[in-house]
């Protein structure tokens, strides 16, 4: 095995010299034996650049504590590889494919390198089919696509992770498919909560969790999405199933790339991001696709720094998405959850050919009513409701009911709200909103529409107010 020596350590960046001049290839994994807290551990680093002469620069994928100059480094001759297949189900892995849930050791039958080319054009499939989530506002106004990519955009604390947890819960229970969850640079507490909730709800056996949390070095946060994607690709290609890939949070992937880029001494571009931002995002997103063997449907939470959608990181992710679910702070401030913005959220399948005439007409009418209500806000604020025409008064009352009706109790939030979660089928969603916009339930109090499932639940709730 080819061996080198550490020449310099700056944080997570290692400069390593190979005396014989046989340099490892870019992205090869290097092994370094280190003593951490009195224990011998193998540290893995990944080759990033050849810096001239016989030296390379690598980024460590775990803490560099305990490393010293002159230490021996071994070139493994291949990129980082992670275990794939049924043995991974129900377990938590780190970026290197090691289990971190303190469970029994897994029997690895097959491993795959995390750096792989995207599928060729002739392997791709392009059929369009709506993916039912059971969440009213999404299914009605910004439907997801089977085998498509969806972005959940939102600032801090508007409910991206809760929405992802509900989607995992609904999909496991209603669709029975495999899910792969990539925790990229998010809170360890949330990762722990997700694991416990999955165990309690019984969906863990159909899920693989792959975590690179906030406290880990940038190299681990940058590569953990690729580790999770490699596991998802195996389910798609070898087993031929429809897989769900959840990434929380894709912004942290770009952020980690920015940190690595700065550590490697590259010139920053706009807003301090790495010059290779769109290349890195493209390399990841092009692999998340559907082939003739199976599909990967991906839902990616995208943190929006300072609620600015024009920031280069979220703006770069936009280009790859089929549907966008925008979470709004103004809506969450009203206490409406999920805080999905019905006017800002979009979907590429929002047309009558895919959705059917009835669904499309109802969705557009709901958006028209909400848009008109938004336009009238200034008049209402300055002059009051009395200055509106009779038609507008009816429309505003209906819009307020629709706004409340777009809220929904979640299964994963039962412990916080005490309200049992509701899964609403697409047909029930369309039927319910059709009846609301046609004025059949204008006589019901608007509070009856808050945090319910279908229109039948709202009618039942209204009986309690009358009593």
Swiss-Prot record:
It is an enzyme of class 7 (translocase). GO terms for cellular component: plasma membrane; proton-transporting ATP synthase complex. It is found in: Cell inner membrane. Gene3D superfamilies: 2.40.10.170, Bovine Mitochondrial F1-atpase, Atp Synthase Beta Chain, Chain D, domain 3 (1.10.1140.10), P-loop containing nucleotide triphosphate hydrolases (3.40.50.300). InterPro entries: AAA+_ATPase, ATP-synt_VA_C, ATP_synth_F1_bsu, ATPase_a/bsu_AS, ATPase_alpha/beta_chains, ATPase_F1/V1/A1_a/bsu_N, ATPase_F1/V1/A1_a/bsu_N_sf, ATPase_F1/V1/A1_a/bsu_nucl-bd. It catalyses: ATP + H2O + 4 H(+)(in) = ADP + phosphate + 5 H(+)(out). Pfam families: ATP-synt_ab, ATP-synt_ab_N, ATP-synt_VA_C. Its main location: membrane. Its EC number is 7.1.2.2. SUPFAM superfamilies: C-terminal domain of alpha and beta subunits of F1 ATP synthase (SSF47917), N-terminal domain of alpha and beta subunits of F1 ATP synthase (SSF50615), P-loop containing nucleoside triphosphate hydrolases (SSF52540). ATP binds at residues 154-161. Keywords: ATP synthesis, ATP-binding, Cell inner membrane, Cell membrane, CF(1), Hydrogen ion transport, Ion transport, Membrane, Nucleotide-binding, Translocase, Transport. The keyword Ion transport applies. Produces ATP from ADP in the presence of a proton gradient across the membrane. The catalytic sites are hosted primarily by the beta subunits. Belongs to the ATPase alpha/beta chains family. NCBIfam families: atpD (TIGR01039). HAMAP family: ATP_synth_beta_bact. F-type ATPases have 2 components, CF(1) - the catalytic core - and CF(0) - the membrane proton channel. CF(1) has five subunits: alpha(3), beta(3), gamma(1), delta(1), epsilon(1). CF(0) has three main subunits: a(1), b(2) and c(9-12). The alpha and beta chains form an alternating ring which encloses part of the gamma chain. CF(1) is attached to CF(0) by a central stalk formed by the gamma and epsilon chains, while a peripheral stalk is formed by the delta and b chains. This is ATP synthase subunit beta. It comes from Leptospira borgpetersenii serovar Hardjo-bovis (strain JB197). The lineage of its organism: Bacteria, Pseudomonadati, Spirochaetota, Spirochaetia, Leptospirales.
